[in-house]
């Protein structure tokens, strides 16, 4: 049987409960068999660089997994594939590196990012290699997106210290101990 792997890339600056809700929903509904979280190295289409460095964002993803329910956390892993890549981060390069014959790959993406997919590097090739699971943003009316009761949490608001309750306990502790985002 072919394994269905969800590739969930993002800046994760920081990873928050909205991201984790998507993970739990995809796995508990058996839409995918496992998920790989991939913090972006240098996202090409972002206007600003991530605030936290790659190692901190990678660690926050690992910590967030520990706070997931038993039975879910075992199906989630974190990859440093993009953090360790020099230069801009492109989804196609990640998929080509992760491509496995015994697996069907699904790129998990927000509806806002998916609306710009044709601007991605080698987008047509990417579309041939993966299926997309499009996640609706709160307040969006995108009918093509998967119906997940998404949480209205923003990494920007977390960084501005407005919603530290929007991250998992282990991630909150990490942010506070390292004083991440404190000056923002």
Per-region residue spans from a language model:
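Nucleotidyltransferase catalytic core that binds NTPs
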Residues: 1-184
């Amino acid at each position: 049987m072919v394994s269905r792997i969800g590739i969930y890339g993002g800046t994760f600056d920081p990873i928050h409960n909205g991201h984790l809700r998507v993970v739990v929903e995809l796995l508990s509904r058996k839409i995918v068999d496992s998920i790989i979280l991939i913090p972006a190295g240098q996202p090409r289409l972002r206007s600003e660089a991530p605030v936290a460095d790659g190692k901190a964002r990678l660690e926050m993803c690992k910590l967030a997994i520990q706070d997931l329910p038993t039975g879910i956390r075992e199906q989630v892993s974190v990859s440093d594939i993009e953090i360790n890549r020099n230069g801009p981060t492109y989804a196609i390069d990640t998929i080509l590196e992760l491509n496995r014959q015994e697996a069907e790959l699904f790129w998990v993406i927000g509806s806002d990012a998916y609306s710009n997919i044709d601007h991605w590097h080698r987008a047509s090739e990417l579309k041939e290699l993966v299926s997309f699971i499009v996640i609706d943003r709160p307040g969006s009316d995108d009918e093509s997106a998967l119906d997940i009761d998404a949480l209205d949490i923003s990494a920007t608001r977390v960084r501005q210290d407005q919603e530290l309750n929007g991250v998992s306990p282990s991630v909150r502790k990490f942010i506070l101990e390292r004083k991440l985002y404190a000056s923002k």
